[in-house]
Amino acid sequence: MSLQFAKYHGLGNDFILVDNRESGEPRLTPEQAVQVCDRNFGVGADGVIFALPGSGDSDYVMRIFNSDGSEPEMCGNGIRCLAKFLSELDGGAQSRYRIATGAGLIVPTLTETGLVTVDMGPAYLKPVEIPTTLTGTGDRVVEADLEVGDRPWKVTTVSMGNPHCITFVEDVAAVPLAEIGPLFEHHPVFPQRTNTEFVEVVRPDYLKMRVWERGAGATLACGTGACATLVAAVLTGRSDRQATVELPGGPLQIEWREDGHLFMTGPAVKVFSGSMELAA
């Protein structure tokens, strides 16, 4: 089996994009996606994204397999890459797409500057929506106590259609991400596991973040994580509603509008196109 693909990245968060418009099911199995994502024996990527035919009021459907074969609901950097990929496939005929994801309908728009702005929809804050068994004040978990790795942490939980646990630190560079990240991801208070963001507030309009992604580990960027980070920073009084979130791969501009929707603006870059032989 020969797989035709294009590789894109959003701030170093890299993906294999597959034109899957002829079928409503991904061309690869989760096991094959693991093979493709392997950085030694495959192409190498944080995940494989499939552009499937639209349904209902969507132009396309987005499916993703992480590098471990798991399937997340959505990916912010990935959907920017998908928008650029779709624009290439249709010859630039569209600049705005309505894409159905496991987190709902997401609308990316290609800007004249080459960046992609995405209406990420609203954040969800109720514990059952994360989901988490943590209890908080009212209908949200803000600065809750959680012991991870034999030390206490203050955590805020946010769902962008996928689960996020945000904790604020003095020095984000000093966080032992490879050690503590898996402990957060698999903590029993998160029945569907979680993405975890470690955040340093430089200014109310400038946040530095590192992320441990559920199913992918440490990555250079996470779009939904940047959105969840801004929400947590606003809820805890640390940030304005519009801020730059600096990730290891570069900055994203995030805005939490008064109507509740979050908008993310950032790059998506094509690296190359190619083919790979896979066992049938």
From Swiss-Prot:
Compartments reported by the entry: Cytoplasm
Catalytic residues of the enzyme: 75, 222
Coiled coil: none
EC number: 5.1.1.7
Positions of the record's site feature: Could be important to modulate the pK values of the two catalytic cysteine residues: 164, 213
GO CC, alphabetical: cytosol
Known catalytic reactions: (2S,6S)-2,6-diaminopimelate = meso-2,6-diaminopimelate
Sample GO molecular function, one term: diaminopimelate epimerase activity
Domain of life per record: Bacteria
Binding site for substrate: 13, 66, 76-77, 162, 195, 213-214, 223-224
Pathway: Amino-acid biosynthesis; L-lysine biosynthesis via DAP pathway; DL-2,6-diaminopimelate from LL-2,6-diaminopimelate: step 1/1
Major localisation: cytoplasm
Assembly: Homodimer.
Family: Belongs to the diaminopimelate epimerase family.
Protein name: Diaminopimelate epimerase
Native source species: Synechococcus elongatus (strain ATCC 33912 / PCC 7942 / FACHB-805)
Organism taxonomic ancestry: Bacteria, Bacillati, Cyanobacteriota, Cyanophyceae, Synechococcales
Gene it is expressed from: dapF
